[in-house]
Design a protein with these regions (language model features):
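Short, low-complexity N-terminal leaders and the immediately following helix N-cap/first helix
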Residues: 1-66, 95, 107, 331-355
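Helix-rich terminal scaffold detector
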Residues: 3-4, 178-305, 309-315, 326
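Short beta-strand/loop turn elements enriched in aromatics
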Residues: 16-25, 46-71, 108, 114-126, ...
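Glycine-rich, charged/polar anion/phosphate-binding loops
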Residues: 36-42, 139-142, 170-177, 243, ...
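Short, surface-exposed secondary-structure edge patches
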Residues: 46-48, 82-87, 93, 144-147, ...
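C-terminal terminal segments
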Residues: 48, 125, 208, 328, ...
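Short, glycine/charged-enriched hinge/interface segments at domain edges or termini
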Residues: 55-231, 245-246
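Hydrophobic, low-charge alpha-helical segments
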Residues: 319-329
């Protein structure tokens, strides 16, 4: 099965968790909104200065020019958080800090570096007069009421992710709590008789430390889920059935297994899923990760990943990541995809899509450039991390999904 078709099968089999919970707004970063949030007030509520400078009546400086400077008296100072009590009189300016309210009568701000402070050598706090050599335009360098948010404006819609900008707006509006979708629970079941816990004091030469489960747990967290790590299950069909049933007792929204999903003599994971439920697909026309399967057991989706660390990571990103984001109620579940120019040729088997990690960077003249990463080259310092989709021998360009920002 093609991986795009596999994605469709998985997403069509899932329903968002649909359970909301209310969290304090400072804890909502990265969560998915379950309600529409409206701005309770204009932000800002009054005109504020965007810069450190001088509040001015634009009409007083309308004729200012380099050859015809306008001299105005400094009537005082006003800092951020201080109420403007006096009206700005014609022929005067008021030294203001960034975020300070504009006094009545002022309708513009001149940045201090664009004014000549008198007497010369004085600083802003001790200025007595200023010379303006360029006109002030009404509203210049001023935050007007509602510039950042207007009362009644939609700040968040259901399915929106609370990013830093949204969090800043919510906090600035004094919104104390937010209804968000519950994070999906993901049970992670590593399989393999050769595995020992990653932190085991000792591992025999014929054994392997189980790193997959820990890596997948971190990916689950990045995708917005809550990982539940389960004990290692051996390569035994009956034991795997029992391990799957015990995993379902933890009420996961998704069960992810690693290992035993191919066709080797000791690969029993897919068979155990078939014994207990339904296998919707097994085997993908991809490399790595041909031994990947998906099914349902007691209504719980089960994603069976390969046992290799890199293969498991890649297939989770391609299939598990969008599934988890869909379960979590996100509106957009797929990573952005671009067409990239390859810095070296890449080969792929006929009829198979090769999934290849790559480092990507933007070049103003050539567009996206992709450098394939090989087995031990995991990092992309200063560049995007991405995944190439090679559908045939590619010498020039290939599709790529963008993952980690530089």
């Amino acid at each position: 099965m093609h991986f795009d078709q596999a994605r469709h099968v998985i997403l069509a089999s899932l329903k968002p968790v649909g359970e909301a919970e209310r969290v304090p707004t400072p804890e909502a970063l990265g969560r998915v909104a379950a309600e529409e949030v409206l701005a309770p007030e204009d932000l800002p509520r009054i005109p504020l200065s965007r810069v450190d400078g001088f509040a001015v009546r634009s009409s007083d400086a309308a004729q200012a020019a380099p050859g015809h400077p306008v001299r105005l008296r400094v009537g005082g100072t006003l800092r951020a958080g201080e109420a403007a009590s006096a009206r700005l009189e014609p022929g005067t300016v008021l030294a203001v800090a960034t975020g300070a309210p504009l006094p009545a009568g002022a309708d513009a701000v001149i940045p201090w570096e664009e004014a000549v402070i008198l007497p010369r050598g004085s600083d802003v706090r001790s200025a007595q007069e200023v010379l303006l050599t360029c006109p002030a335009r009404p509203g210049g360098h001023v935050f007007q009421p509602g510039d950042q948010a207007r009362r009644g404006e939609v700040l968040l819609r259901p399915g929106d992710v609370v990013d830093l900008a949204a969090l800043d707006t919510l906090l600035s509006q004094g919104i104390a709590s937010l209804s968000v979708w519950r994070r999906p629970r993901v049970a992670i079941l590593p399989t393999g008789s050769e595995l020992v816990p990653w932190d085991a004091p000792e591992a025999a030469p014929h054994q392997a430390r189980c790193s997959n489960a820990v890596l997948l747990a971190r990916l689950v967290e990045q995708a917005g889920g809550v990982p539940v790590l389960l004990p290692i299950a051996p390569d035994d069909r009956g034991a795997l059935r029992q391990a799957i049933l015990q995993a379902l007792e933890r009420s996961p929204d998704l069960l992810v297994t690693t290992g035993g999903a191919s066709h080797g003599p000791f690969d029993f994971t897919v068979a155990a899923v078939a014994d207990l439920g339904e296998v919707l697909f097994a085997d993908l026309a991809v490399s790595p990760g041909q031994g990947t399967a998906f099914g349902l057991v007691q209504g719980v989706p089960v994603l069976c990943l390969p046992g290799g660390a890199l293969s498991a990571r890649i297939l989770f990103q391609v299939l598990g990541w969008p599934a988890l984001r869909h379960l979590g109620g996100r509106e957009h579940v797929l990573q952005p995809r671009v067409r990239a120019r390859l810095t070296e040729g890449v080969r792929a088997r006929p009829g198979t899509v090769r999934l290849l990690p790559a480092c990507l960077r933007w070049d103003d003249s050539a567009g996206w450039l992709a450098t394939p990463r090989h087995a031990r080259e995991f990092h992309c310092p200063g560049q995007w991390e991405g995944l190439l989709f090679i559908q045939q021998d590619a010498q020039e360009t290939a599709e790529a999904e963008l993952w980690e920002r530089p």
